[in-house]
Amino acid sequence: MSLFNKIVKEFQWGQHKVRLETGEIARQASGAVLVDVEDTVVLATVVGAKSAKPGQDFFPLTVDYIEKTYSAGKIPGGFFRREGRPSEHETLTSRLIDRPLRPLFPEGFYNEVQVVIHVLSVNPEVPADIPALIGASAALAVSGLPFNGPVGAARVAYVNNEYVLNPTREQIKASRLDLVVAGTERAVLMVESEADQLPEDVMLGAVVFGHEQMQTAIDAIHELVREGGKPEWDWQPAPKDEALNARVTELAQPELLAAYQIRDKQARSTKLKEVYAATSAKLEEEALAAGTVAADKATVGNILFDLEAKIVRGQILSGEPRIDGRDTRTVRPIEIRTGVLPRTHGSALFTRGETQALVVATLGTKGDEQIIDALEGEYRDRFMLHYNMPPFATGETGRVGSPKRREIGHGRLAKRALVACLPSADEFGYSIRVVSEITESNGSSSMASVCGGCLALMDAGVPMKAHVAGIAMGLILEGNKFAVLTDILGDEDHLGDMDFKVAGTAEGVTALQMDIKIQGITKEIMQVALAQAKEGRMHILGKMKEAVAGANTQLSEFAPRMITIKINPEKIRDVIGKGGSVIRALTEETGTTIDISDDGVVTIASTNSEGMAEAKKRIENITAEIEVGQVYEGTVLKLLDFGAIVNLLPGKDGLLHISEIVNERVKDINDYLKEGQQVKVKVIQTDEKGRVRLSAKALLNEAAGQTDTPPQQ
């Protein structure tokens, strides 16, 4: 009898064969599923605590996606030779998996849940993120935890005007779209995408196509659960205290209504804190008078939050003005200033209402490119975008330090939005780093980073293909009634049902991200949201074009200049020298940065034009070929009885025979030449062994109008 009750489900999914297994590995976890997609293998596990911690008032879900280097047949680098802190890719994939899972846990479920996905084997052509998301969904489904799944996911490419399901890496490179969509049988929950200025209908079509295709995976998970699922947990939400709800509503509703008539964020926030504090204090006072225990502040806070949501959502659905007085389609006032920082290469201050981004662009050389050691192999990235949001941006105190998951995710979204409109490396050879410092935040700071990033790049002289703007949309959905909100505030994000971010140019979409807090939305709602987002984006693009018509034609005086020369690839080793000695001396002595590609393209960069010219001259000398008939100013290295060894170029010497020094007979060479002396010579012969014969006499004869003496054999 086997130790294992192993259940296996296999299905064909697009061009890939998928295998789901449970019951053999990680049996002590609440749920564990092994997913194999054409040799990319992931193990997804989930463990749920049997009870919530006392006083817990939020859902503590953690998702960790971990890539093991052995999966690609590698040993980790570093002193310890083991995996360390998560890479940016691992962090982004963890967020990608978390986002569609989180809204499917029932309200009031506060037990700690941890989802861990290990990448165990990698086929370089099959990205592991979709198998990981499918595995996490399946592990939750078989665990018996209260979870309204399963979730399916799919990657969609757009090649030759056709959608491609779960493309290979090579197909992704040729595609104008890289879109990941996740959802349930009924609706879409999450979208993450990067596109090359595609129209809205193509983007929507990709989402719908992905949702249709993921049903195959959802069906397979259902079958796996039927045969290998654990019993469902007997969990019920804590009963609501209707009396407490009624009393909190009675005490706080008038004050909350008044607070949401205040248009200024800081003043409104102060008023809301006062309402929360006063309500809790009044309830404690009443409990003390009655000799009972007061409701804990977390419970009261949750009731007040629900009451806030009801007020704000009700006002919007009934056609009343939004929190800050706008209607559903209006973008907040925009102010733009470029060239803000005098010594940076490019900078912009982009302000939209109470959201503000100070964005800086820096130009570098090929040596500044980011080297990324991925499972699929090492590669370089010439464009970096980093997003920072310090606590002062929201008027709060807090930790300052390394970027959190949210900051990494927002930075990647802004990067996705801009990368399609960057010039190619052939057009603009610089590496580029954009840093967005969020100095104020009240909603949609990632989209402010897109707008500010585009403006900072143009200020730096980067020839962008087009202006790029981004906008965040919200949704209020109650039954069959819904309202799509343009340019959402932070409070509308917290109290609403959707965060839908769209970035692009006047031609089309470059990035789209959608997160749904309810159990999915329909195609019709997405259609309305995309159309309204385009309207808002065009408005912002108009403001940006008014402020900055196009990229600066001159780079900042503080940015490095570049020149490019082509050398014989066989001469690369001469420029580098033994152990890098030659190129190291070149860069140090000329104050330049020198990059050499395998095809012999040499890029010299410096803020000093004289240093660049000197480096160029020296490289040309190192790689130059000695030609018969050329005249050189050489240095006498060594005197011999029969002539002198003369250095013509770095590493290239020739023989000046005693008979080629002057026309008369030379008895003692020391009468004519000394070591270290500069002498002008002409190349009169070279042979297949690289030996070079020189003549000074030939130049004397030419000056006197005589013909050259024939070279000696």
From Swiss-Prot:
GO molecular function term, any single one: RNA binding
One GO term (biological process): RNA processing
Record has Nucleotidyltransferase as a keyword: yes
Reaction catalysis annotation: RNA(n+1) + phosphate = RNA(n) + a ribonucleoside 5'-diphosphate
InterPro entries xref list: ExoRNase_PH_dom1, ExoRNase_PH_dom2, ExoRNase_PH_dom2_sf, KH_dom, KH_dom_type_1, KH_dom_type_1_sf, NA-bd_OB-fold, PNPase
Alphabetized Pfam families for the sequence: KH_1 (PF00013), PNPase (PF03726), RNase_PH (PF01138), RNase_PH_C (PF03725), S1 (PF00575)
PROSITE patterns, sorted: KH_TYPE_1 (PS50084), S1 (PS50126)
Start and end residues of each KH domain: 560-619
Gene Ontology CC: one annotated term: cytosol
Compartments in which it is found: Cytoplasm
Sequence ranges assigned to domain S1 motif in this UniProt record: 629-697
Primary location: cytoplasm
Function: Involved in mRNA degradation. Catalyzes the phosphorolysis of single-stranded polyribonucleotides processively in the 3'- to 5'-direction.
HAMAP family: PNPase
Family recorded in the similarity comment: Belongs to the polyribonucleotide nucleotidyltransferase family.
Name the record gives this protein: Polyribonucleotide nucleotidyltransferase
